[in-house]
């Protein structure tokens, strides 16, 4: 859902992206700094609980937006590269691990149901990009799905921030379980894209022989 907004957001980021490029900042540097900011914000703020959950979300959000800024910078500068794509994808996984891992740590003792929900989001969510990468390695387009990373990240941070403002914890717990289910569905959708692209693998020997004839 939110992935479809990338072209619009990219245009909004054009001005600051040009400014950073004028200062000689490399897109890969923005990617790395953004990830470090997310990791610090999640690991420092979330374990303190309470209102620090909200402030952690605010801090993290500032750095999450760099995920779009670095891409805009790369396109404007013509510095798009395989290294940049690799860093962007790999460091996204690091950021996700920090966010959901910090939530697991925060609630592991007093709220095990919430901790388990965060753990499921982390575990199942890691399969989503793998399913796409493996499909693309086979030459198959398996983008999209009911809940891409940006969707899960937005909803997870939103629920965390609301709990930090004093709303009931079940809002976060329920949201995380729903996100885990949506991530599983997304993996299934991408798997089906591969299945549809390789229907011949499911043909019986008799069907294959008659087809060749």
PLM region spans:
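Hydrophobic alpha-helical transmembrane segments
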Residues: 1-61, 98-213
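Hydrophobic, well-structured mid-protein blocks that either form specific transmembrane helices
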Residues: 59-111
């Amino acid at each position: 859902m939110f992935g479809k907004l990338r072209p619009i957001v990219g245009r909004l980021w054009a001005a600051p992206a040009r400014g950073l490029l004028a200062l000689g900042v490399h897109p890969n540097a923005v990617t790395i700094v953004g990830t470090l900011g997310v990791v610090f914000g999640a690991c420092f703020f979330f374990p303190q609980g309470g209102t620090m959950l909200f402030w952690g979300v605010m801090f993290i959000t500032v750095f999450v937006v760099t995920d779009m800024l670095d891409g805009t910078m790369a396109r404007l500068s013509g510095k798009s590269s395989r290294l940049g794509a690799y860093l962007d994808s790999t460091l996204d996984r690091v950021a996700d691990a920090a966010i959901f891992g910090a939530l697991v740590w925060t609630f592991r003792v007093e709220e095990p149901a919430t901790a388990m929900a965060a753990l499921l989001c982390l575990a199942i969510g890691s399969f989503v990009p793998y399913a796409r990468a493996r499909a693309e390695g086979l030459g198959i387009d398996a983008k999209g799905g009911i809940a891409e990373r940006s969707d899960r990240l937005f909803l997870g941070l939103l629920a965390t921030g609301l709990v930090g403002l004093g709303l009931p914890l079940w809002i976060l717990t329920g949201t995380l379980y729903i996100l885990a289910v949506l991530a599983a569905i997304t993996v299934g959708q991408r798997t089906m894209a591969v299945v549809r692209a390789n229907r011949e693998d499911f043909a019986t020997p008799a069907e294959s022989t008659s087809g060749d004839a």
